[in-house]
Amino acid sequence: MNPSAESPSSIHTDCAEVQVPGQVFLVIAVASLSENLLVIVAVIKNKNLHSPMYCFICNLAVFNTISSFSKALENILLLFKDAGRLNSRGPFELKIDDIMDSLLCMCFLGSIFSILAIAVDRYISIFHALRYHMLMTMRRVLIILFTIWVLCGTSGALMVGFFEAATVKIFFIVLFFTALLLILLLYVHMFLLARHHANRIASMPGAQAQHRKSGLRGALTLTILIGVFVACWAPFSLHLLIMMICPENPYCECYRSLFQLHVVLLVSHAVIDPAIYAFRSVELRNTYKKMLLSSASRICKRCA
Amino acid sequence: MPRFQLSNSTSVPNHNYEWSYEYYDDEEPVSFEGLKAHRYSIVIGFWVGLAVFVIFMFFVLTLLTKTGAPHPEAAEPYEKRMRLTSCADGLGRQRETDGRTGLSRPLLEESRSLFHCYINEEEREGGRAATDAGALTHGRSGIGNSRGQVEEVGLVVQNMVLESRAEREAALLAHFNIPNFVNSELNSALGDEDLLLGDPPIIMEEARPRCTHHIID
């Protein structure tokens, strides 16, 4: 970018790119890493959580862990570069940059697919409750997870390799909108069934008034789930769309100047995910309590 | 894109080429002159649209909560539920004495017997379950009435436990805490919609293959 070539009048009306300090990324990445590692450890340790639903939640946590790890690594390397210890144009650094970008890409795709898998799994468990264990055997779950990993790995590598092509951006945008639509449909249908049953219970004599409060709570949970998904992924998808459609429009330029903020939102999705999916489970929370108690008792034994 | 100019005198090739690269910014700088609307209008429009979408979705879901009309056949399923609760009552009393062991074997035995009790109740029901099966299974009647009954029982079992959360002792709920299954969220204080977003409800694996084969065959 050659600032001297710009006309003076355009400088102060330009939408300068909003820079987010690297420390913010680092803090978010470290928080996400610790949360998701906790989820993975809890799911592995507790035998009760070796079921299809928790496999998908653990898979989401693994993708989030890898993405936050690579984001943290990228920021550390940027700090080194700012300190002058790294050459930003060297071949080794470019290769590392490509590898980290493809890992990030793979993890973003993987989180979308994992969220979809969790929604489909919940849907099957509600609407085909009695056939659930025939439909979702552990073998099928492992096959699904393997497919997701292979698909995301190759897509991530291809997307970073051919990022200039418009196909990559179109693929990402289409994937986001499809996932959003599917999640909306599945969860709203599940919600409608739950309302139907709650109304039938409420119509019985002796029903309590907590029925309405629980309905509001369900609506709130669903809104948070879908709202967080859209708020974290839509800005980035719109950014890709705008890059393709209007690269020279000043309004679009102002939107594109907020790129780093949109990436912050993407990374913060990895922080919020455990709170929405994993930590809502009572069994997982009990596992944490047991882990804390056992480690506390071990420390006490060493002290005494 | 490189741009080069040939010198005017072509008779003497003195190679007066001028190379320069053109950046898009130099050629067509994004002009911010004369913008009609605010420069961040796309950003503002996007976030306002997103907020409107989320709030609209919340209001729609809340309205669905409030305006759920009572089911016209409310009396009949109530009786059926009372009959089915008798199954759970009998077994619950039996198991209260055992206490809350948390062992898988006795729990599976009891869930098997509970399931058989429900299936027997359903079979005794006869043809009355047609409308209810249709309502509960949402039009999957093509599969067959008995299958619909089985699925209806599954859903009614879900309802049962929803109900029992408020009324029964925790011992009955522990009945459904079958290890290696997705644990039921229903013994927590979450709302019944969180049923969707917590763990799936009662899945009785050992009992089901035998029972469904018995019903479907």
From Swiss-Prot, chain B:
Annotated TM spans: 42-62
GO MF, one annotated term: corticotropin hormone receptor binding
Residues annotated as glycosylated: 8
Protein known as: Melanocortin-2 receptor accessory protein 2A
Source species of the chain: Danio rerio
Note from the entry: Two paralogs of MRAP2 are present in zebrafish: mrap2a, which plays a role during larval development and mrap2b, which constitutes the ortholog of mammalian MRAP2.
Record's keyword terms, sorted: Cell membrane, Endoplasmic reticulum, Glycoprotein, Membrane, Transmembrane, Transmembrane helix
InterPro entries for this protein: MRAP (IPR028111)
Membrane-topology descriptor: Single-pass membrane protein
Function: Inhibitor of melanocortin receptor 4 (mc4r), a receptor involved in energy homeostasis. Plays a role during larval development in the control of energy homeostasis and body weight regulation by decreasing ligand-sensitivity of mc4r and mc4r-mediated generation of cAMP, leading to stimulate growth during larval development. Acts by stabilizing an inactive conformation of mc4r during embryonic development, when all the energy consumed is obtained from the yolk sac, possibly to speed the rapid maturation to the mobile free-feeding juvenile stage reached at 5 dpf.
Keyword Membrane (UniProt): yes
Lineage: Eukaryota, Metazoa, Chordata, Craniata, Vertebrata
Cellular-component GO terms for this entry: endoplasmic reticulum; endoplasmic reticulum membrane; Golgi apparatus; plasma membrane
GO BP terms, alphabetized: developmental growth; energy homeostasis; energy reserve metabolic process; negative regulation of adenylate cyclase-activating G protein-coupled receptor signaling pathway; protein localization to cell surface; protein localization to plasma membrane; regulation of adenylate cyclase-activating G protein-coupled receptor signaling pathway; regulation of growth
Assembly and oligomerization: Interacts with mc4r.
Keyword Chloroplast among record annotations: no
Cell location: Cell membrane; Endoplasmic reticulum membrane
Family: Belongs to the MRAP family.
Pfam hit, one: MRAP
